[in-house]
Amino acid sequence: MKTCFVVCGILLSLLISAQKVTSLDTLTIEKIFGIKGKANNGEYKITIPQNDLSIEVDGFKIIPAMGLGTWIAFTPAKNGTMIMGDIVVTETDLKPVQQEIIRQGLTISAIHNHFVRNHPNVMYMHLGGSGPTDQMAQKAKAVLDKVKEIRGGDPSKGTASSETVTNTLDSKHLDDIIGYKGEMSKGVYKYTIGRPDVSLKEHDVIVTTFLGFNTWAAWQGTPEKAAVAGDFAMLENEVAGVIKALVENGIEVVAVHNHMVHEQPKIFFLHYWGIGNAEQLAKGLRAALDQTGKKQGDKMNMN
């Protein structure tokens, strides 16, 4: 019996050692990028607001807080660090930036829109990679430098950095309807809603809310005429119900796509855009949220 305990103890120790990952060297990441990011539970994210782009959708100004931001997130992995990122690109940026991503040995997992009728047109390119932290930071930095080169300057230092949008919405009323509390930034009231009901992994690494596995909604405008843009994170059996709920409530679905390619379970993302009475839009989002997080045995109402 004693021998069994010893052997079992050794095996457990080896298993823990094999699964152990080191903490991120955030100082090295900051030094390579030249900017300070945000840390969260052992993960780290660099965000670049696209202040050099002046974009409108249906008369509403789209500022970085409405979803116009590039980001690179770092999380510990067995071989050092796994990165995930979302790069905002114009039609002019698209080809040279994707060439740079491939040149750096990173992968492209999605290219898609967030909006329609937006001028100028922008797209979002998701990238990924894993390896030593310093190498991943250098590769991601090279991609961001390519964007700077094409646009002729640092996107974060554009003229839109001081811009705000009109927001006279009753945020407390929205909170009560949606069931979550948002945060205000430059006139944009934004909800970020995680999926704690789903244990998501990419290459056997946990993908958290902070790494982009979330549903979000960004608001601006007035109670009578509000605009809301956002993203739903959905399991495959939730997609049809979420789309149905949004469309039936006057909210336009503008994109359905993936962000990752090796994730388990499979996750789909949906972008939407709504204009109208704020209370009605909030009720529509709540109806769509009710289609997510259901137990496997629950039946989806498609009537």
Residue spans for each PLM region:
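N-terminal signal peptide c-region/cleavage motif recognized by signal peptidases
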Residues: 13-18
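Positively charged n-region of N-terminal signal peptides that target proteins for export
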Residues: 1-4
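Long, contiguous binding/interaction regions
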Residues: 19-121, 128-267, 273-303
